[in-house]
Amino acid sequence: MNEPQLLIETWGQPGEIIDGVPMLESHDGKDLGLKPGLYIEGIFMQAEVVNRNKRLYPKRILEKAVKDYINEQVLTKQALGELNHPPRANVDPMQAAIIIEDMWWKGNDVYGRARVIEGDHGPGDKLAANIRAGWIPGVSSRGLGSLTDTNEGYRIVNEGFKLTVGVDAVWGPSAPDAWVTPKEITESQTAEADTSADDAYMALAEAMKKAL
């Protein structure tokens, strides 16, 4: 059996167009009642697909890893992520830029929502500024696991994989369809703001006017 190693996966390509349209997650009211703030939401991970790092996560293995991560980190409000993905297994809270609030499955895709951490002049403020300027971040996961080679040009993640960081916000992302939708929730809104960069900027401008 191979020794466990740090597996960093960059899931998706920011701004990727599939069949002529951006791969944006459709929102169905799940987000009603969110606290005011800036969020990123979309596909965090994918099972049963060869990603850009030439690795495949069997669904049964990723399901267990995600379930454990939700129970151990998301539900206990420990699920932090950073801006970019440093080469270590765990998050440095001093460098945290986001906190994951929810994760769920749709088919073979793991969706999630993370709140951008703002107000301390730290990495989250920089991430928020980039998003409000129109940047679309990608997402990257970190975990510990071993790999098995195949004869088809990719490697399979073995049983025992442990997800240690559900998502970091990164530039230039690895699952074919995984990138995220920024959205702004203001004091006067219970539904999400429009996900286009222009409309997100307008929502922010309106919120600033109301605060004056």
Swiss-Prot record:
The self-cleavage of the N-terminus allows the activation of the protease. Probably also self-cleaved at the C-terminus in order to detach the protease from the scaffold protein and allow it to diffuse within the prohead to cleave the prohead proteins. After cleavage of the inner core of the prohead, the gp21 protease also destroys itself into small cleavage products. The N-terminus blocks the catalytic center. It holds the Pfam family Peptidase_S77. The gene is 21. Serine protease ot the inner core, which is activated by autocatalytic cleavage after completion of prohead assembly and processes many prohead proteins. These cleaved peptides from the inner core and the auto-cleaved protease escape from the capsid, thus liberating space for the phage DNA genome. Cleaves the prohead proteins after the sequence motif L/I-X-E. One of its GO terms (biological process) is viral procapsid maturation. It comes from the Viruses. Residues 117-136 are annotated as: Homomultimerization. GO terms for molecular function: serine-type peptidase activity. This is Prohead core protein protease. Optimum pH is 8.5. Its EC number is 3.4.21.-.
